[in-house]
Amino acid sequence: NGDVIGDAYEYLIGMFAAGAGKKAGEFYTPQAVSRIMSEITSIGQEFRAPFHIYDPAMGSGSLMLNIRRYLIHPNQVHYHGQELNTTTFNLARMNLILHGVDKERMNLNNGDTLDADWPSEEPYQFDSVVMNPPYSAKWSAADKFLSDPRFERFGKLAPKSKADFAFLLHGFYHLKESGTMGIVLP
């Protein structure tokens, strides 16, 4: 069963994260937090099919996977995620595969979410956006982002020392009008 193997894999990720301490924060959100976020972001969308979820800082992919527990059609979830760290990107891809997610329902990218918007093709707005971005990380906040559709309507950029705020704006940009976003912030 894919879920049993996938759950075992997530358990091992959690054990590794516990042993890695603070450094693990870049790829792991505790299961209790992940479940609460999934339950909240699925409220009112339980019957939606297909359901598109996006995590622009996907880490291990657990935030996206947990949404299935709260949807009537869990096999119609499409997963869209991006991760900067290549090793962590591969960890997430393996996590989704071990949970039985078909490659047709996986749209993952290894890249810098804030530096270059992704995804830029359909679908680029989602039923749910979930994320646990790196806390108070730095980002370029270059003037070119003032004309970036994700940020331009605000007329001002997140400070260079507050990438978490830029992630929040990125999430709003990719959220459907009827969608729900869950984000872990300091």
Question: What are these language model-derived features?
Answer:
Residues I5, Y9, A137-K138, A142-D143, ...:
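Short, flexible segments with low predicted structural confidence
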Residues A18-K22:
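Conserved adenine-nucleotide phosphate-binding loops and their immediately adjacent elements
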